[in-house]
Amino acid sequence: MKGVVIFGIHHWGFSVRVPRTSAGGSSYIVPPITTILGALSRGYCSDYAVKNNVSCTKEFIDKFSSDLFWVTYGTEEHMLMPYSDLLREERVPYRQSKNRSLDHVSDWFGVSAFGKVYCENVNFSILLLLNKENSEFWSKLGWQIISLGTKESLVTITDVKVVDVEESSDEDIYTIYYIPAECLTNTEEFEVVNMPVKSVYELSSKPSIGVFSNFLVPRKTPFIGGKVKVKKSNVRGDICKVYKMADKYVITFKEGLEKWYSK
């Protein structure tokens, strides 16, 4: 198996809004699989127009998701800090016409919280484990990533490497990448986060939130990220495997993304 390692730097941090929260919302503490797939689709979708109210990202995932065995993200430094910006913003457009007069000026504004993760100049890497020998295609898409999250969540890609992927039997595993929660029996030094693995890309008046799964994110309170030691005996070998890509370890389901994305 081949893999692609995408190295980059966060400019200030990122914001990936959590659905089903209030208007203020909060941000995921790491970019989930769906965000990474969306970022990779940018190169493919650069000249694409929305067709039949369906996002280009859906076409990209339908066409190429079978190429990917697994996708994950991690940072070498444990320096990611979640926070919320409180802003007093104008709410006039959302008010009934009877409440837009000067007599109701005190109701024109409201406080909103915008969830973000601050990680200025923090180095990150994205791992792509490939089912097919098309590393050149995925390397090109990796170089074209400009943000992870909102369009303001800018990143600079510094390097993209193609490496060999092999199963690991090492007793001590050091990883910076998030892991499916079912894969470990002991979750110390991790935080359990419910994140999207499959999104809904059709524009519709009916709400839909996609498919979610629990992941273990390395965390040394109060900061997120960094390297965590995992014993081989802590990995559930009946449902998960450990892979090594150069000097990087990743733990995932035996079926990889096929758990949610059928070939």
From Swiss-Prot:
NCBIfam families per record: cas_cas5a, CRISPR_cas5
Summary of subunit composition and partner proteins: Part of the aCascade ribonucleoprotein complex, minimally composed of Csa2 and Cas5a, which binds crRNA. Other possible components of aCascade in strain P1 are Cas6b (SSO1437) and Csa5 (SSO1443), while SSO1399, Cas5b (SSO1400) and SSO1401 have sometimes been seen weakly associated. Csa2 is probably the major RNA-binding subunit. The Csa2-Cas5a-crRNA complex also binds target DNA homologous to crRNA, probably forming an R-loop. Purified aCascade forms a filament about 6 nm in width.
Gene behind this protein: cas5b
Organism listed in the record: Saccharolobus solfataricus (strain ATCC 35092 / DSM 1617 / JCM 11322 / P2)
Keyword list, A-Z: Antiviral defense
Family affiliation: Belongs to the CRISPR-associated protein Cas5 family. Subtype I-A/Apern subfamily.
The protein's name in its UniProt record: CRISPR-associated protein Cas5 2
Signal peptide range in chain numbering: none
Function, in words: CRISPR (clustered regularly interspaced short palindromic repeat) is an adaptive immune system that provides protection against mobile genetic elements (viruses, transposable elements and conjugative plasmids). CRISPR clusters contain spacers, sequences complementary to antecedent mobile elements, and target invading nucleic acids. CRISPR clusters are transcribed and processed into CRISPR RNA (crRNA).
